[in-house]
Structure formats: C-alpha cells, structure tokens
UniProtKB/Swiss-Prot annotation:
Top-level class of the enzyme under EC nomenclature: ligase
Name assigned to this protein: Tyrosine--tRNA ligase
UniProt cross-references to CDD domains, sorted A to Z: S4, TyrRS_core
Source organism of this protein record: Streptococcus pyogenes serotype M49 (strain NZ131)
GO biological process: tyrosyl-tRNA aminoacylation
This protein's encoding gene: tyrS
Keyword Cytoplasm carried by entry: yes
Length: 418
C-alpha cells in the first residue's frame, strides 16, 4: 500500500486537484509539500492535528515538509466560512504567537534528521519585503474579481459584507505557494477542506505566472457521529498547549469519545498500523463496555502531544479520582483533575466549622442541609468521611499547603484554596 492509499484508507483525503497526477508524483520520488498555520491564537488545537499528523505521515514516507507559519496572513484574517470579520491582532502579538506555534510543530515533525527534515518558514519574511504596488502588478493581475468572488468561502460573506483586507486573503495564500515553489520547489499544499478556495488560488497563480503545475490535497474537517464539529470540549477548544488544556483534560476528552467514532479516530489521530487498529476494533466490538478503543486513543494521542510521563500522570489522576483516593494525588495533579470544579478561596484556615464551609462553598444550600449532610455521612474531606458537626478545618486538611477537596455524595465537589 503506497502512502496515498494509506491516507485514503485512514479517511484523510477529502479532495485533490488531480489525484492521478498526485499519486504519480508521490510514488516516483520525494515531494516537497507545505501546510500553513495562521497564528490566530497562542496555541494550536485539536482541529489542527489532522493536517499536522498527515504531514508527519508523508514525512515518514520520505517526503519533505515545510511548515508555514502565517506571520503575515495572520495579520489579515482568513474569511473562509466565517460569519463575521476577524479581530485584527497587533504585529507584536502575532509575532509572539508565531513563535509559540513553531515550538509546538517541532513536537510532531522531524526538523533535524535526513534529507527530508522539516523546514519552518514564515510568510512575513517575504510579504514584508513586497510593496503594495509591486504586489498588485506582479500578483494581483493574475486574479480576476469574478474568479475571487466565485469561491464558496467568499460567497457566504458577500451579503453580510467583507472587507477588502479579508477579500485579498486568498491572493496572499496563493502567493505563499508560488514563493515556496520558486525558492524550495514545493509542489503540494495540504490543508483543511474549508481552505480549498484559498489553496487552489495557489495552483492558479503557479499555472499563470510560472507555467507550472501544483497539487492540492485537503483533509476532511472532522465531525463526530452526530455531525457536531470535532475538537471542542464543553464548547471550548482542546488546545495542544498543556497550560491551556491539561494532559488530564485531553485524556478525558478522548476517553469520552462516542463508540461510533472511536475506531475512525484511531485511524486519523494515531500512528498505530491499520492491522493493529483492526485487531483493536475486533476486541472493542466484542466488549464495548470496556472502552478499549477510547482508552487506546487517549493513550496514543496524549503520549504523542505531551509525552509518556504526562499520559501516565493523566491515567493515574483518572484512576485515583475514580477510587476517591484524593490523598494519593499532589495539589498540582488535583488542579488538573478538578479544573472544572468550583473553587472557594479561604483567607485563613482558622475557625472554619465544617457546616459553615459547606454553605460558603455552595456544597450544601443551607446550614440545615449541611448539618443533615454531615450527620448522614455524605461529606468527605480529602476522601475521608466527616460526621462530626463540630469538625474544624486545620492545616492537616491542606494538601501540599495549597488546597482541600470537599465532596458531597458521589459527584459534587468543591476545592478550597488558600
């Protein structure tokens, strides 16, 4: 099975400009290709991972990746299928975000070894050297307004309004392809299916300005089995930066993937062989309650993104919280595992009766209910049941001198911080 066939089997090919010609190029020799990442935030997220891992698969097959950070296009904003104009960021912010994204990409691509080692490029390097007049004369003349307005990504915005700034975005992305082809012989661009219009602007410019053929391959925008856009947890993006989404949170995200999606996601997001995935699928279907596919998915992706130690820690937090063994975890581990739990800041540990704390931390709705909860054995401090109405919090209840975990019943938590 050649690399293109494997990508198709894994569900990673959505659209190509000329599949037959692309397969021929990929099988006849080394292809230089690129994927672009605009710094619209200070971290990449799971939505970017499909293109990143596809790029890595091609590198493992011997082809040469160029990772383009859009220092210039990030200043403009991509209008593709967006309902409204993006907020423009300052140059300083975009530069800072660009550097962070470069660091994240080095986790997945090999920038050091072999003749196909990855290269990092930033389109600010060439766009900052082009005058507006030169850009209009040397690039703009190859694009008709009719051609630009025919793009689905632009059509959606015509009625609501689109600025010239965003309208020109596709020409800038097209020029990226031309520049990389001219300087590095890049002949293939990879990106999300929502980028098709911008990406084919590049092949159009290559054809008209240089009389060359370029290839485009889009990866699908991933949705779950209900049609919901993939990559968000509780409406928030799942970031690749551990400070924005902890390894534990990422682990839980994958662990909670629906059964109907789990095997498909193993093909897309892991480097397990198709034979290994087929074996996992057989075992998974025989005992879905054991969630083998989800556990494998969580292990593989968290290890890939954050490393084996982070995976082991996330697994340990999961197991200890499930067993109620709060004291077996450090304060930092508890902050990961209980990040969505309400916090109540306590100025001083002194003179805090358990009943008062339960009400103040909104664990119990009233003092009467709090007293009943304590007497009925429903209250736990750091995993230990408390049934004494006169119980006073003390320094012994602090974990790593930072926090105390209170639980009511099986699921209602609060974290006291000091």
């Amino acid at each position: 099975m050649n690399i293109f066939e494997e990508l198709k089997t894994r569900g990673l090919v959505f659209q190509t400009t000329d599949e037959q010609a692309l397969v021929k190029a990929l099988t006849e020799g080394q292809v230089s290709y690129y994927t672009g990442y605009d710094p619209t935030a200070d971290s990449l997220h799971l939505g970017h991972l499909v293109a990143i891992l596809t790029s890595r698969r091609l590198q493992l097959a011997g082809h040469k990746p160029y990772a383009l950070v859009g220092g210039a296009t990030g200043l403009i904003g991509d209008p593709s299928f967006k309902d409204a104009e993006r907020s423009l960021q300052t140059k300083e912010t975009v530069l800072e975000w660009s550097d962070k994204i470069k660091g994240q990409l080095s986790t997945f691509l090999d920038f050091e070894n072999g003749d196909n080692k990855a290269e990092l490029v930033n389109n600010y390097d060439w766009f900052s050297q082009i005058s507006f007049i030169d850009f209009l004369r040397d690039v703009g003349k190859y694009f008709t307004v009719n051609y630009m307005m025919s793009k689905d990504s632009v059509k959606k915005r015509i009625e609501t309004g689109i600025s010239y700034t965003e309208f020109a975005y596709q020409i800038m992305q097209g020029y990226d392809f031309y520049e990389l082809n001219d300087k590095h012989n890049v002949t293939l661009q990879i990106g999300g299916s929502d980028q098709w219009g911008n990406m084919t602007a590049g092949t159009e410019l290559l054809r008209k300005k240089a009389d060359k053929t370029g290839h485009v391959m889009t990866v699908p925008l991933i949705t779950d089995s209900t049609g919901k856009k993939f990559g968000k947890s509780e409406g928030n993006a799942v970031w690749l930066d551990a400070d924005k989404t902890s390894p534990y949170e990422m682990y839980q995200f994958w662990l909670n993937v629906m059964d109907d999606d789990a095997v498909r996601f193993l093909k897309i997001f892991t480097f397990l062989s198709l034979d290994e995935i087929a074996e996992i699928e057989t075992q998974f279907n025989a005992a879905r309650h054991e969630r083998l596919a989800q556990k494998t998915l969580a292990r593989e992706v968290v290890t890939l993104v954050h490393g084996e130690e982070a995976y082991k820690q996330a697994l340990n937090i999961t197991e200890q919280l499930f067993a109620g063994n709060i004291k077996n975890l450090s304060a930092n581990e508890l902050k990961q595992g209980l990040s969505n739990v309400p916090n109540y800041h306590v100025q001083s540990i002194d003179n805090h009766n358990i009943v008062e704390i339960l009400v103040a931390a909104k664990i119990s709705p009233s003092k009467r209910q709090a007293r009943e909860d304590v007497q009925n054995g429903a209250i736990y401090i750091n995993g230990d049941r408390v049934q004494d109405l006169d119980y006073q919090l003390s320094n012994d209840d602090k974990i790593d001198d930072q926090l105390t975990v209170i639980r009511r019943g099986k699921k209602k938590y609060a974290v006291l911080t000091y």
